Regions:
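Conserved alpha-helical scaffold segments that buttress catalytic/binding sites
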Residues: 1-207
Length: 207
């Protein structure tokens, strides 16, 4: 992280967030490695033209992968502190941080770090809405990501796309999200409207 002054985007990954069962590795602990493998072609061919945008893959931007940060299967608090500190360190260089998880508890300290320095609009794409207050006494697990994020002062707007089916929330969770002002866009809404353009009014709302 000491040489990012001229870097546009800095990627780092966290294999472990806040476990519900300390000592048990996250179901998504291997995700960073899998994502890097899947994207290896793009990183090795940055000069290739992307016909969707009609621009080179990285469009002249400098992107650096900082690798995995240290994590623990037993100490969620330490993991959160490391993610938070790493994010702030990257922001201090002027680079844009991108976090690769890890389960859905890893964004909590990431969003907290960004929100400590600037207004934030969250767009979540997930089958689950993650508004549980706690599970088994743990308030920072992967089922509470959006609720915890909503508590950060600079989070101005939350749009959640893709929530579906049973198992995503209880009535109280949905009520809390709606009371906060979350805008939901479910697959059913997409089927009815036939277009993601129905999101446009949400995205154009003032921050």
């Amino acid at each position: 992280l000491d040489n990012l002054q001229d870097v546009d985007v800095a990627i780092f990954s966290a294999c472990h967030g806040t476990p519900y069962k300390p000592g048990t590795a996250s179901h998504a602990a291997n995700a960073p490695a899998a994502i890097r493998e899947a994207l290896s072609w793009y990183s090795s061919n940055p000069e290739q033209l992307d016909l969707d945008t009609m621009k080179p893959v990285f469009s002249g931007k400098t992107v650096v992968d900082c690798g995995d940060i240290n994590g623990s299967t037993t100490d969620g608090s330490a993991n959160r502190q490391t993610i938070n500190r790493t994010t702030k360190d990257i922001l201090l260089t002027g680079s844009i941080p991108i976090l690769i998880g890890g389960d859905d508890s890893t964004p909590i300290p990431f969003i907290e770090a960004i929100a400590s320095q600037m207004p934030v609009v969250i767009v979540q794409i997930d089958a689950h809405i993650d508004w549980r207050e706690e599970i088994g006494g743990e308030r920072f697990g992967f089922s509470s990501t959006m609720r915890r994020s909503s508590e950060f002062e600079n989070v101005r707007k939350i749009i959640q796309i893709g929530g579906r089916g049973p198992g995503s929330a209880r009535p109280a969770d949905l009520a809390a999200a709606q009371a906060w002002g979350v805008k939901f866009f479910s697959p059913v809404m997409f089927i009815r409207t036939g277009s993601l353009l129905s999101l446009t009014p949400f995205l154009k709302m003032p921050i």
